[in-house]
């Protein structure tokens, strides 16, 4: 009858499935894409290693075998463990803590070999000497009494698997990375300097163009001012000449006064307005001449005279 062993195996398998589900759920919550088969394989490899190296799996199965033997009437294992199985709750809590510690140590890379050696031996330093004394713990003594210690006559020089760091190569790698980063920074800086120089050149060129345009605008403004002054002088001379010519004409005083008022109303400051005023004056003169001609034409008709334009 192996019902307890089967139950323990089922619990271990369920724990593995729970570990896989926890890992995939965590990756999904973090928004990380993953391959389920790869996660399953990695978790299984780590889970099997931790459970086997820590001894948790064998410990649970051993207790299950002891319970099955007791159920089958074989109390040898149960009697052998009665000294420490005094309280089931205390023992269960103690086993739980020990199993946690074993799995934690296994996950940190402290394998079973290292844990057993640390538990079986301790080192005592001798003050003032470079040598030391290796002391066997009670666990080592119990193992010797139980015949769990073997003497290997063949000497095997096994190198301890210790992660060594080649600081020189690490420094060389960091130096290469630093040089590469320095080169990239210099390239970007040089590129930025070239762009800045080009921008400055364009800015100076634009400033020169603006300066030339400003000079041209100033010249044009000066020319316009001169032209405006010449036009103002010309219009003033024109008005004076027309007034003098008007006074020399044999026209009625009211006609002369009317024309002089129109001449004085010409804007001599603004040439555009002056041209408009002169145009208005010319139109009025033509209109007066047209009215005079119509009056003369009507008078000739009343006197039974005919006229002809040659």
UniProtKB/Swiss-Prot annotation:
GO molecular function annotations of the record: RNA binding
CDD domains linked: NSP3_rotavirus
Region Interaction with host ZC3H7B, residue ranges: 167-231
Chain spans, region Interaction with host EIF4G1: 205-310
InterPro entries: NSP3_N_rotavirus (IPR042519), NSP3_sf (IPR036082), Rotavirus_NSP3 (IPR002873)
Region Dimerization, residue ranges: 147-203
Region (RNA-binding): 1-146
Keywords annotated in UniProt: Coiled coil, Host cytoplasm, Host-virus interaction, RNA-binding, Translation regulation
One record GO biological process: regulation of translation
GO cellular component: host cell cytoplasm
Subunit structure: Homodimer. Interacts (via the coiled-coil region) with host ZC3H7B (via LD motif). Interacts with host EIF4G1.
Function summary: Plays an important role in stimulating the translation of viral mRNAs. These mRNAs are capped but not polyadenylated, instead terminating in a conserved sequence 'GACC' at the 3' that is recognized by NSP3, which competes with host PABPC1 for EIF4G1 binding. The interaction between NSP3 and host EIF4G1 stabilizes the EIF4E-EIF4G1 interaction, thereby facilitating the initiation of capped mRNA translation.
Name this protein carries in UniProt: Non-structural protein 3
Lineage, opening ranks: Viruses, Riboviria, Orthornavirae, Duplornaviricota, Resentoviricetes
